[in-house]
Amino acid sequence: MNGCDEVDTIRDAVEKALQKCDVCMAGNIISREGLLRAYSDFVLSTMEKEKHNVGMILHTGSACSACFDVLLIVCAALSNILYNQTATDDVIASLTPGDKVLYYSGKEKTRAQRYTFCGFVNSYDDPPSDKIGELILLDQGKNGKTYLMKKNWSGIVPYFGESASLDGKGIRKENGKRKSFFCDVLGMKDSEIPRTIDTSTVVVMSKEDADNILNRLTFWFSNMKVGLTELVPISYYTDADQEYPYGNNPAKTEPVIKITGKVSVARSLLLDRSGNRNIGLMVLGDEAVRRGESELPELIERKSLQYVYLSMPIGSESSEKMVDCYSSAAVFACTKDFLLCNYVNAAISNQETDILNAQIDAIIDKEITTIVLPSLINWETYKEFKNAMYFIKSEEYSTDKKDEFIIHAYSLMKLFMTAAFSIRYMEKLIDDSELENVIKPDERLTQITEYSHTFPDCLKSKAETIINILEIAYLSFFDKNPKEKALKELLEKTSATHIAIVVPKAYYIKLMQRVLSEDEKLCNRDWRIDIVTANRFDNSNMYDLIIAIGNITGNRFDILRCQASKNITAILYEAEKHQFHRNEKRFKSVEHMLNQRSAIHVDDDYENESSDVDESEIATVEKIDDELSEYFDSVAIKAVRNSADYASRRNVADIVAVAKFDTDEVAFFTKNYKAYVLDDLEHTIKEVPADSIVEGDTIVFTRSNSRTRDIVEKLLRDMITNNLVSDNVKVAYKQSRRWKTVLIDYMNNTGSTPVEIANQMIKNGVTVQEHTIKSWLDEEAHTVRPKKLDSIQQIALIAGDEDLFDHAEECFAAGGVIYKIRRQILTAIGQTILGEITGNDEQLNPITTTIADRIKESAVVVQVESISFVNDTVPLNSINRPISID
């Protein structure tokens, strides 16, 4: 272990280092905060406690997750430096004559140049040898030879870059801050400062979060500041062999911190036995944990890893499950009791710590208020409805009309329990075409009544019970809605200026906006009200007040776990109250479990409260809801299989995911499909692979009568046809498609498979995989051009197309032009759709203006209500688009 006294552990060494410097985000010191000091101590105390250590970190929330993630990455980077066993002698011994190296010359060793390592000599007259001698001979071609004595060997670093030039071009002179950090903070001698480090940590986190941290993270010491990327090489990996470096890494040495957005890529990096020894894995963020759930157990249990940390907000859906799964894991959980025992006032007030302390206050001072309203649908009636639904679902009698009956009846009850508007008002907006893809409740009632007429006698009684209850609810809420009245009264009384109203479905947003804007007492208030679905709730915002219109939970919102406000109110009917209180009891039980598991002692006063209704009744209703949700997924796949094509296994496609939208439509996604997902923060559209789509995502499709499912392609073709783009773009569009046309024609004529094409390209020296060829061919993948020019050249060579080979550079450049305009179209779509949603229709650029009307004609915007990942097949004509299951 370099730079430490022999008795020091890694923990002691890193603790000493953190005492000698401040860790900052955008110049704001964060490492002096009491909670973050306790957190750093937890990480360092568990990092090397055993040969294999697992830690679960449940921090205060998304708004301040960067503070926790920063310190975790800092601990990883510093521990890698200190675990490093590579000495100068090891570096020199690894060199072979002919290897490229960098040599850092001068007293401060801050300037590097490229050389060829020739070998060792004992005198200037000796021929070089691979046996270690007194001098090293470096050759720099025209610039001559250099002989180095042993005292200068520490300035030699293997060079793994692609530059063939033997000089210092493109290599920036170091500013000396790296050396100062290693000496002043880590206590190393000049000769101990490593140029190469032989261990790495793999980190799973989003590219956006990684950029946010690494672009802002600095250390302050001795009146200097230095970034983490100046101390150790760090790279982001989109695939195991696709690396994008952060900062400067002139020798192109292996990264010490390897970041990726996917657990599958992290697995590949960890299994790679060449190069550095991987000592740790960190998975940061609820989405990263949730998406990698199936692959994480294998990695967490890898005994070769010194440490594994999973970090997520304490309010996340995954937190309880992960802590429960790993009973021996060390736990750092920011429960209310933990914070009361360990939190002290802010050490420094700045932008970062203020957010952290606001989130801490939101946990400690959080007050959840329930407004319980009377309703004709009481608990007994609600139970009767659920039991009748379960009875019909469980009967062996199976028809499409039975499936439709269950789906529509379930949706109607959900509407009646959560609506904060009258049914009359809702149906008026539907009649006025202000709500698209929403069926009027009275039409649904008529439909399920007609479906029930086809049922056998054994089901008719239960069906009548369901219909009668729904008709009572329909009439009860037709003219007036108790939740609407309670919501308005609450808003009239509150002094809050930033409010979130959480609703279950996206179409509620427009309804609620209209309802509130038409109220004279509310419309002129100076406040900001965000109306969001539970699946689109942004926990990184901090609100004065959050109002949930019912016992609503989603992928990104849970009333009891939410840390985005001190004040949360749930407006409930009596039938919802019992499930809500059961959830409260469950939440308190989980908090008690986390306090008991905490690595830092926590006192709490947990008592198991009694309920005013039979717990088994509530459990039965919850079980029915769970089984009905599973039933809906199976109904969707079964419905689309009722076709002649599927029966004969003709024209079928493999699917990897089934999504259900807030329109009650579904979509079946194939492996290579990339969805156009609305990014309301960036005001643009992102292309998201099928396996990365999550609940709450808003996806933009073309309308079902379009010839192409790619809305960007449709709009671009339309703009070309109507002369709305320049002649250069028209020419580029034609040229950009040529490589793909040549490849498809060649494969059709020769019967070549993607694997055969990949093998031919590999033989010719171009690294490519079978799935890459498949994604080129798949129009759903939206591939405009290959990533590298030589791929187009290889396609031309394989197909024997000399003209394409001669014009490969033009074809590649044309692809760049089209890629750029596609990105502009995506941004324009995002701006236009967000303008529709927010009412701000300001056109920000000419393309937005050009396509605004066309988007309204071409686009369908839906929100993912739920998504499940499968391995199945469906008819080809039902993939990658929203369809109704009739």
What annotation goes with each model-predicted range?
Residues K763-K787:
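Recognition helix of helix-turn-helix/homeodomain-like DNA-binding domains
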Residues G141, N175, M205-S274:
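Inter-Walker segment of RecA-like/P-loop motor cores
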Residues N2-Q113, S123, S129-I132, L137, ...:
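Helicase motor interdomain insertion/brace
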Residues H52, A93, Y606-N728, I795, ...:
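Preference for solvent-exposed, low-hydrophobicity sequence contexts
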Residues V289, V515-A619:
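Conserved RecA-like P-loop NTPase helicase motor core
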Residues S752-N764:
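Short alpha-helical "recognition helix" segments of helix-turn-helix
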Residues K252-T369, T381, A575-S589, L594-S598:
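Signature of the SF2 helicase/ATPase Hel1-core->accessory helical subdomain module
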Residues K787-D806:
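DNA major-groove recognition helix of helix-turn-helix/homeodomain DNA-binding modules
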